[in-house]
């Protein structure tokens, strides 16, 4: 998988105000990968908020399986824009049916009580650590026989 291909999934086409279309990428699963729908829905919501706001909370509901061979339309509802917070509701649609809902809240970063560290920890880059396949191969004899087959097939996503 190329980084360019993955990042391009989050470059949505603007259909009209608050309505976006995202291309699907068939990863070989039975249905559209939910992480893609979630990421595109969040990208669509970001298109409608001021650039100084960051997502700090979202809740999602996967309603129906999506079709990886078809694009997804994202309908963003502006719930509220306040001085510090913005709220959005996003509906993902395929074939006229809602397949996913997300409610997201965005906030202007402020000083105050922190529940999580805003910065990523200092870790090696992905290229410097072994992939899941390399790990499985190195530990093949330690993995129960029924799990070996399930873990050894080629996946279109490189996990590190």
PLM feature spans:
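Terminal targeting signals and extreme-terminal segments of soluble enzymes
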Residues: 1-160
């Amino acid at each position: 998988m190329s980084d360019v291909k993955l990042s391009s999934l989050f470059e949505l086409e603007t259909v009209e105000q608050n309505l976006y279309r995202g291309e699907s990428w068939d990863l070989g699963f039975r249905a559209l990968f939910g992480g893609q729908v979630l990421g595109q829905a969040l990208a669509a919501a970001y298109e409608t908020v001021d650039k100084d706001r960051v997502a700090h909370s979202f809740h999602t509901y996967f309603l129906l399986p999506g079709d990886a061979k078809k694009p997804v339309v994202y309908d963003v509802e502006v719930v509220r824009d306040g001085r510090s917070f913005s709220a959005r509701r996003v509906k993902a649609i395929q074939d006229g049916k809602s397949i996913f809902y997300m409610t997201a809240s965005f906030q202007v970063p402020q000083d105050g009580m922190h529940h999580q560290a805003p910065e990523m920890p200092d870790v090696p880059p992905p290229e410097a650590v072994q992939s899941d396949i390399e790990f499985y191969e190195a530990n093949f004899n330690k993995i129960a026989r029924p799990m070996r087959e399930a873990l050894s097939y080629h996946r279109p996503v490189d996990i590190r």
